[in-house]
């Protein structure tokens, strides 16, 4: 159902690339939007001289996992169809929750034997819903996004505790997924 997706397209003044990027905004899956990331995505499109599409995916806590992932998958398929290009020519990019969503989409497509995107650029992605990695514990206090705050964001997204075992949700699980080139 592509009719429910809101996707904003960015075209640079001088398009010098056939590259198409699908961008996912950050915000812990709870806050932010295409609008909050508008200036950043314009800058990205301008500097790369490439077309960028920014997706307004459904936010938690009203919309639990995997609804944002479903939105992302619908978006990449729509962009592919509308531009008559294979998904393998579309790159993904996202920051924070958006970085998680990009990696989650690549993992989902790999595990289901769907065509993979060309590449993914993950900017400080959320990866560990358990929030118990060495660095997460070591830097759990004294920073804006400390361990307790991150746990809160993950809990807003989780439909159940079973999400921890889902490799499209918990990116610290090594599922033998073949992933695209990653930066």
Could you tell me what each predicted segment is?
Residues 2-183:
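Alpha/beta-hydrolase superfamily serine-hydrolase fold, recognizing
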């Amino acid at each position: 159902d592509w009719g429910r997706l809101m996707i904003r397209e960015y075209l640079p003044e001088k398009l010098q690339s056939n590259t198409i990027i699908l961008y996912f905004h950050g915000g812990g899956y709870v806050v932010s939007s295409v609008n909050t990331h508008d200036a950043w995505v314009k800058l990205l499109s301008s500097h790369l001289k490439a077309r960028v599409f920014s997706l307004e995916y459904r936010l938690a806590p009203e919309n639990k996992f995997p609804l944002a992932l479903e939105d992302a998958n619908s978006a990449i398929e729509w962009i592919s169809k509308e531009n008559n290009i294979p998904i393998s020519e579309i790159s993904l990019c996202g920051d924070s929750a958006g970085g998680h969503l990009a990696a989650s989409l690549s993992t989902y497509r790999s595990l289901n034997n769907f065509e993979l995107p060309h590449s993914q650029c993950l900017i400080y992605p959320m990866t560990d819903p358990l929030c118990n990695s060495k660095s997460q514990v070591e830097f759990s206090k004294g920073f804006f996004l400390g361990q307790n705050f991150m746990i809160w964001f993950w809990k807003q997204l989780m439909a159940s505790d079973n999400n921890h075992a889902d490799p499209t949700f918990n990116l610290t699980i090594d599922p033998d997924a073949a992933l695209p080139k990653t930066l």
